């Protein structure tokens, strides 16, 4: 019986720390407030090899996005972070070194958020308001610590796995649910009320960098967005930041 209790407790903790929509370890945002608002987000940058091209692509379609850079890369590429914000995109906190927060104690968790906040504030002269945990992994004290730093936790409704080394065509296929959801909401498909997201829009998690190194190859992410942005636009989707997507 004791073993069963331990296993059950471990299962609950795993659910709370890994499942994106779990609110067990603090409130998380996985959807936008309106079905036509698509929040495209990028983790693990800035990336000198890809982020500038990505900014040009987003500009072409008048798309605003949210970037969650790693603090150590913010310090390495401050001008790129500054340019990203100057183009109207939102900058969030993705920790200083991209650890597995599941295995971090309160002090280490607090330091990871603090250092990344400071790195961003040094560049933009203001602290971020949004935070995304690396790998989406959380711990029991993260919610309170994020709140102490004035951070809201952003998760996602779709994460297609663009960190994997796969052809762009594979990633394009993995991003199909965004269009399917838009068509459902427009009445072209069946209602998705059973999914509990009626009237809500998607938060898409992509990666413009590789947390292990600068200049990581994310060409497939760029190509997939080149394919989908005009199609999403034609479906009537509005590309918004996390703050824009959760207001109103």
Please report, for each region that a protein language model flagged, where it lies by residue.
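A cross-family glycoside hydrolase active-site/sugar-binding cleft signature
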Residues: 41, 66-70, 92-94, 132-134, ...
């Amino acid at each position: 019986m004791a073993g069963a209790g331990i296993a059950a407790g471990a299962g609950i903790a795993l659910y709370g720390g890994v499942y994106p929509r779990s609110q067990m370890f603090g409130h998380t945002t996985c959807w936008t407030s309106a079905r036509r608002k698509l929040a495209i987000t990028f983790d693990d940058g800035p990336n000198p090899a890809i982020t500038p091209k990505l900014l040009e692509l987003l500009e072409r379609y008048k798309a605003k996005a949210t970037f969650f850079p790693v603090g150590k890369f913010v310090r390495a590429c401050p001008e790129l972070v500054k340019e990203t914000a100057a183009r109207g995109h939102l900058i969030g906190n993705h920790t200083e070194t991209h650890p597995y927060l599941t295995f971090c104690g309160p002090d280490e968790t607090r330091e990871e958020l603090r250092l990344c906040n400071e790195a961003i504030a040094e560049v933009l002269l203001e602290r971020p308001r949004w935070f995304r945990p690396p790998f989406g992994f959380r711990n029991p004290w993260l919610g309170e610590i994020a709140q102490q730093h004035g951070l809201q936790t952003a998760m996602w409704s779709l994460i297609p796995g663009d960190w994997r080394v796969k052809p762009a065509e594979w990633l394009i296929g993995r991003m199909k649910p965004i269009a399917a959801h838009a068509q459902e909401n427009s009445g072209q498909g069946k209602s998705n009320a059973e999914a509990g997201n009626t009237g809500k829009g998607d938060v898409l998690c992509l990666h413009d960098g590789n947390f292990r190194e600068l200049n990581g190859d994310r060409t497939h992410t760029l190509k997939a967005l080149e394919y989908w942005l005009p199609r999403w636009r034609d479906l009537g989707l509005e590309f918004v930041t996390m703050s824009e997507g959760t207001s109103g």
